[in-house]
Amino acid sequence: MEKTKETETDNKTLIYHSCYGTDAKVSLDIQMYYSNGNICIELNDEDYKEPYGCLTVNLCDATPNYCSYVDVNNMPEAEDFIVENKLGVFTGLVKESGFVRYPLYMFDAERLRDLCPDGMIVYEKGKGIQAVQKQKEEKR
């Protein structure tokens, strides 16, 4: 039987393929950067129950809702991870900081709600987006 690369192990656990040849089972922890309200997405290692890395980076500029710069400096596979797991799309915009060009991604709110519902409630409430969530619940 041929072994295929898994990208998702259950509803809330994803596989992060490292450039070092290892795979980690990770879950998302969604928060908000205090200085500008941008979405912050951290990865937690499910096997070791500790932080794995931060998918996003705070470059001080406020971005549109659900958008954040991706930390390709410390997590070079971050863009592949986002695409493989259908977490968001590249906006075409980048910001330079030092010698690094950080891509701006718009994250899929529905997908993030599925993977980290509590974090998204806090993020959306902090951004004043809770009306969208209420409208969705009313349709059910």
Each predicted region: which residue ranges?
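Solvent-exposed, flexible loop/coil segments flanking beta-strands in beta-rich domains
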Residues: 1-16
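Catalytic phosphate/metal-binding cores of nucleic-acid and nucleotide-processing enzymes, i.e., regions
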Residues: 8, 20-23, 27-43, 48-54
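Generic structural motif
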Residues: 31-33, 46, 60-62, 109-112
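Acidic, aromatic-enriched beta-alpha/helix-loop junctions
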Residues: 38, 42-87, 91
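Short beta-strand element of the conserved SAM-dependent methyltransferase core
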Residues: 43, 104-107, 131
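Short, compact, well-ordered microdomains
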Residues: 72-124
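Short linear proline/tyrosine/threonine-rich motifs used for host-factor recruitment
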Residues: 122, 129-131
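Non-Sec secretion/translocation targeting segments of pathogen effectors
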Residues: 134-140
